[in-house]
Amino acid sequence: MKNKKDTLRKAGWLLLGLVFLFFSGGDQPVWIAVWLAPIFILRFFRETGAFKAFFVALPLMVAVEMIADKGMTPFPSFKILLFYSGLGVVYSLLPYFLDRVLMRWIPGGLQTLLFPSLAISIPFILGSYGSWGAKANAMDDLALLQLVSVTGISGIAFLIYWTAAVVNTIWEQRSNRKIAKNVSVAFLIVLAAVYSFGLIRLRSDYRPENSMLAAG
């Protein structure tokens, strides 16, 4: 009975991740779905195990990505579309896989930095599709987007993936209030600093004389 409940719970995490992943794609991605999808996919990996989670999630995520991006991908045949969609999903799953494998070697709250670091560095090392599918594409909060002026779009992605790692660490350490509190405080301080920087920049860096009418 316990095994059945565990299986259903893990399936629930993956299902939620896939639903939010679907709404993260397409030509009108929903920003809240972009933030939530990694939380549940990471939860699925951490409860399931690296290899099993990878091979279960891979075909399902490929299907979701292909449905969400239908009509957007410039490939002449289904086989080519399937190949590149699969390759893209493999790239996107590697951080989850490696996080599950390596997290045991990382002490305490520092574990929260492993997943976002992997999620940013792996596409950089292996190559990616440029800004296609970038997390920042779904964001329309101008204060938050000011971070791009310093870090590029990778900074937005780091925050999104770090959120997933922080939420999962708090979930796992809910009986250890000290670690959960320290992780939460550190995350909120950084998020507040990023947002404050954005608000200040929006209010102080606007010069009408340096602007031009782009449309209308």
Where are these regions (language model features)?
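Membrane-embedded alpha-helical bundles of multi-pass enzymes
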Residues: 2-215
